[in-house]
Amino acid sequence: MTDTSAPAYTALALQSLCEAVNPCKSPEEARAKMMAGIVRIRAEIAGSIAFIGPEVKLVVLPEYALTGFPMGESAAEWRAKAAIDADGPEFEAMAKIASDFGIHLAWNGYETDLHFPELYFQGCVVIDPSGAQVLRYRRLISMYAPSPYDVLDRYLDAYGEDALFPVADTAIGRLSAIASEEILYPEIARLHAVKGAEVFVHSSSEVSSPLATPKNIAKLARAIENLAYVVSANTGGMTGTPIPQASADRGSKIVDPRGIILAEAASGPSMCAFAEVDIALARRLRRKTAMGNLLARQPMALYAREYAKADIHPEGSLMKDGEVQTPAKSFYRDRQTAVIEALAKRGVI
């Protein structure tokens, strides 16, 4: 796209309550609860657009907005209870929201994959106003869930390199997705930015506070480093778990490419995190000859030399003898413990 076609529109980081499916006794009960959540989210989007105005063209939902996260369930149990099919009724209902309201809808959830029946992935999906899925990003760094990195060779065989850091060139700019705590990793955002991403849609469910938190600091940093917008939606509380409801609440925000917070929500379900996204601003900043143009000054070849020598978190750790392994409950903690021990042995930490 050229500057003459650079769009300006309103983006909404919808801070919605997450009603976790952990207490559900069967997959059928969980699916019914998820569909009820979609009905509620649809009503929240309708009310928000009616209040804000028809300029809303991008709505970002919180992380795992329909399910919450696994709390003691095995991989097989969580896959059956909470992971949805890419062509399932939940996706169809979300696509209808996007088409009915003429928006790009970004959402996050656990999903199945026919290539990996032993696993599930946490996916970020963007649906355009026609109801088509224009972006699917699978979370690459996760403490307690499988990721494409854990089965990297097999994943690349199935989907190719471009599936790792996808960028969608849309009518509202070039979009990419960052999942939850991945906002803390500069490389995740940067590898999207070097493929042209101008807007990071960030679905999260995180501890927030009036004080500076690591993730909130990171949102500003990722915007400044990459001269990109960050549209970050947090949960507006979570029910159905032993964790107090407001622990993952408040702080949904929109950050512009200069690191300026344009809008931010307080506690509870809220549509207050909405603001104008001006794609022309991002493009002007990226094409400006200036010290502040950090994206244009990145010595990527230099980084690549040193990164190639580094060995920290292993790839393919859910592969054994060419076969995908279903992770045991202790797998993720055991893996991190082994990484820490290896770093200590080498004198890195």
Predicted region positions:
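Cys-nucleophile CN-hydrolase/nitrilase-fold catalytic domain and related Cys-dependent amidase chemistry
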Residues: 31, 35, 39-138, 145, ...
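Active-site catalytic loop in hydrolytic enzyme cores
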Residues: 113-198, 208-221
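Acidic/histidine-rich helix-loop elements
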Residues: 20-36, 151-153
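Beta-strand-turn-beta hairpins that frame and shape the catalytic cleft
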Residues: 2-16, 167-176
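Short beta-strand scaffold segments in enzyme catalytic cores
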Residues: 107-109, 122-126, 166-168, 252-254, ...
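CN hydrolase (nitrilase-like) catalytic-core segments centered on the catalytic cysteine
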Residues: 86-106, 174, 180-276, 291
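C-terminal beta-strand edge segments of enzyme domains
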Residues: 234-349
